[in-house]
């Protein structure tokens, strides 16, 4: 699907909102489903939007809803936000999306749990001429014209940032015998997680090869099958083991992380979102293996929930990559308003940034 172009998204009101939003502390926001009804500025004509998020199980999504609410306040629009209990509840989310379409709103913002499961509903939205803006996760194979814009972090770049910081921290341990690096991804179905996981894998392989080391990627078939010129497991300098739990919970991510961390050759771990990073930290509560000392497993996380930030601050994690769910939710409402006003849309990319104990 060729992506369309958003020529007019950033009006003066949005620039003000961006500056205000960047100063907000979205990580600890607590929200509930329901309408956000406000009176604000902007050529909104009283639009009503439906928003379907991945879940409300983490502070990440609570921050996204805070951004949605902020944009509604500024534009004078309303938004009803729903989402399943967990990001692995794909069928529940599809039902919520179908219900949203049946309400014939002025637009729908969607953060898809599974990029393939929403193709049918997106076709229906297209037929009903309901604009859809995807945020947090794109839907690359969406029916042509169904998705007006996508507001996402450059997830491949963001995953690569973690590799760029983990690799130099463990480089001196390479070439002295086979070692293992673990990656825990909460799923293999959503575009953002899969792109982020592959971003870490590809960047790590690139850095290792540049220094003359070989890498063999093992574990979850979805990720292994995307690796080009995968190394030989028997002879590789580094085994990069990728694990995906059966469901997207911290507890199951912790089980996967424990399995890798208990192996004697493991020297590094990466949890590619808040749930999986907290899973790595939960595993460490029993194992006490994470840290930056020579005898510890170096680990990095993703997102900026309070548990992850505390682990970065005390040195349990080397650092983490952060993004702004608040601003993605915020941009999504502005994009829907622009679409409802007949403006042309383009994708809105946002970047990931590294933080550690020195720059928190």
Describe the residue ranges of each PLM region.
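Sec-dependent N-terminal signal peptides
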Residues: 3-13
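A residue-level marker of the well-folded mature domains of exported/periplasmic proteins
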Residues: 3-5, 22-360
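C-terminal motif of bacterial Sec signal peptides marking the signal peptidase cleavage site
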Residues: 17-21
